[in-house]
Amino acid sequence: APVAPPVAAREENMVINRELLFKGAAYWNQLCDILLVEGVGGLLCPLTETESVADLAKGLGYPLIIVIGNHLGTINHTLLTIEVAEKRGLSIAGLVINSTSPESESSASKTNPDELKQRVQYPILATVGYQLNSIRNKHEKPTGPHLFDHPFDDINWLTLTD
């Protein structure tokens, strides 16, 4: 079940090791041009019993790409996330608007990108439509609306780290 990391750790009788997270990031950072670290659950989601995802982001020092679900409440959620990031001194590279269900074709989801452009100073890097069956065996023929559109092809990822 999708739960916060400390909850999952308790369910498995494990402890999240903060230092291991940083060592792992440093290791992988040496092996690749770009390292994306998912901020599971959002910036204020608990990461350990005493720290949040925002603390991890601050410690790593990587710029944030804020991924936003495209639905009613997106504008509020985005502005709150940006406010938290800025107050904690986190660098924001931009936003990705992501549709996670076929219901994402609501009036709110259609107007969210333009409304956000008016309210935030960060670029919208991509808007991703709902991708039915996107988690499939890569050898199977894709089906469904918007499947395997490549909204990230035009992003120069290396410039986001500047």
Predicted region positions:
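Structural motif
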Residues: L36-E38, I65, V96
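C-terminal lobe/tail of nucleotide-utilizing enzymes
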Residues: E83-D162
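Secondary-structure boundary/capping signal
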Residues: E11, L64, P123-I124
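ATP-dependent carboxylate-amine ligase catalytic core
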Residues: A1-E51, D55-K58, N70-L79, E83, ...
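Short glycine-/polar-rich loops that comprise or flank the Walker A/P-loop
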Residues: L60-P63, S91-I92
